[in-house]
Amino acid sequence: MSKIKIIPLGGVREEGKNLYVVEVNESIFVLDCGLVFPEEELLGIDAVIPDFTYLVEKKDQIVGIFLTHGHDDAMGALPYLLEKVDAPVCGTELTIELATISAKSQGLHQHIENFFKIDEDVEIEFEDATVSFFRTTHTIPGSLGIVVSTDEGSIVYTGDFKFDPSSSEQYSTNYGRLTDIGEAGVLALLSDSADAENAIQSVSDKKITADMTEVFRNEDGRVIVASIGSNISRIQQLFYAAKNSGRTIF
């Protein structure tokens, strides 16, 4: 029987700063390593990161850092953790490329050789558990959920996600994989719950693209679009709408 601990170091009752520690016997699995940008009352502070004390004290037990996607709330604090611990970092191709840029900006070039690109078909076996992945829908490509499988059952960490059957292939959820995970037995579900209290269903990506295209076609003059820079899905929709309506983007 495995001794299992699940310790949230960030991301609980707050949006951002995601970091879960899953400890199975003597092995520590770090799930995400994000930061959060401060509210207005924290003037002069650029970002808030998790307290790494527990991980630093047990740094020799860390078998890997696993990233769900390439947004700051999931990987923005990674360079600060790597200044204190040395562990393999796993993520999809885009996530690792963004993590590499972030690490280089902090002068952590020596850690990059310990960055590994994975996809949802990869399964990594450790002494105390097996780590696997499943594809999720988010606003950035290459988003994954993480499964830590133990002899007591699986610990499933979703990362940021939504369900949208109209999403394109590179953003689509692997529902078949989710079914397999559920049938195998889940010990604990660590789920994104942002806006879970909102009963209104979010608009599908397909409708957003159609609405943008309609606006572009019907307006005679210039159209100015504002978007969060990290919402790559929305930026791609903007390009699709411009192409379909014969507009040029400046």
Regions found by a protein language model. Name each.
Residues 1-66, 71-250:
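His/Asp/Glu-rich metal-coordinating catalytic cores
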